[in-house]
Amino acid sequence: MAKTMTIDGNTAAAHVAYAFSDVAAIYPITPSSPMAEVADDWAANGRVNLFGQKVKIAEMQSEAGAAGAVHGSLKAGALTTTFTASQGLLLMIPNMYKIAGEQLPAVFHVSARALAYHALSIFGDHSDVMGRRQTGFAMLASASVQEVMDLALVTHLSAIKSSIPFVHFFDGFRTSHEVQKVELIDYEDMDKLLDRDAVKRFRDRALNPEHPHLAGSAQNPDIYFQGREAANKLYLDLPDIVQDYMDKVGELTGRKYNLYDYVGAPDAENIIVIMGSGADVVEETINHLNAKGAKLGLLKVRLYRPFPADRFVKAIPASVKKIAVLDRTKESGSLGEPLYQDVVNALVECGRADIKVVGGRYGLGSKEFTPSMAKAVYDNLDGEMKNHFTAVSYTHLRAHETRRHLV
């Protein structure tokens, strides 16, 4: 019988991260701080990881220092993780380029939080993780506390196997601090899935005076371009690795995951594409509406980087004619938010440009996102198909509650 425990999303992520880490370089920032706190507490009380050792917890002077420590620790052959959010993640970006470029299997667990624009907000959205999507880190999204537990495991296993670093993110406060009863994955079961040969290959690449090698060189125009393109195969192979581990975790737990999971009517014509905790709201909405005769669908995005267009389009029912893409971030001046642009591009590349796509923003700074708002998005697909709409402010859709609007 599976062991259950009542925990929050941060603790679920830390439980898995502790198992796979030799070192955790940390600096506290809301709402990610509890991950570092519980890891520090476990280390102080003698808890050991999958390698039979206590995790070395290194608290630095800032998130910039933590990212530098992660990079250096990885170069020394230690599996390393960190926990961060918002402005803290921004301070880590310079080192993230190096970590990805040098194919080091770091995992950053991020309680996704709003960035400080016109004002600071400690609450959740995807502004921080979208601000680092070009670094070369893979990105995997969890939508609930149980998913945080399961997909954190997929993340660490995939990073070690692929040599590609990951950002595993989940919505700040909404998921990071939500307390649920979840099925705990034991370290013994995690160990059965760990590729020990991949761990050895990683450790063998460590800087060592017994077999020195050059790292961090400066390259001229004759070779830099080729080196930059050399990692392409790793990213092309990564979706298969992630799906393979999703399947193995599914066999272990009985909870099945895919890179892109479709739920709803098999012959739906209108669907929403979304990632993070908002997917649960949309799923609740379509379950209610479909029970009354509607034919609506939802596509949950889990692997966001890399974004394999063929797998994404394959997950869409052939009957679909209209898609609304919901982003939990704002990219001022762009033709649309990041997920919207990726969806449009994927449909064009895979010959499904006949599908009409609109995009909208929701939930910035943990703004409320309700089933009535999700219904308004579906109604928009049946109506004027307003594009670049929001769930609040000057381009909003009208919700279907007499006393509650999207303003």
For the regions a protein language model found, what residue spans apply to each?
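Metallocofactor- and cofactor-centric catalytic cores in central/energy metabolism, strongly enriched
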Residues: A2-I7, V23-T30, P34-D41, K54, ...
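Conserved small/polar residues in nucleotide/adenosyl-binding loops
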Residues: T395-T402
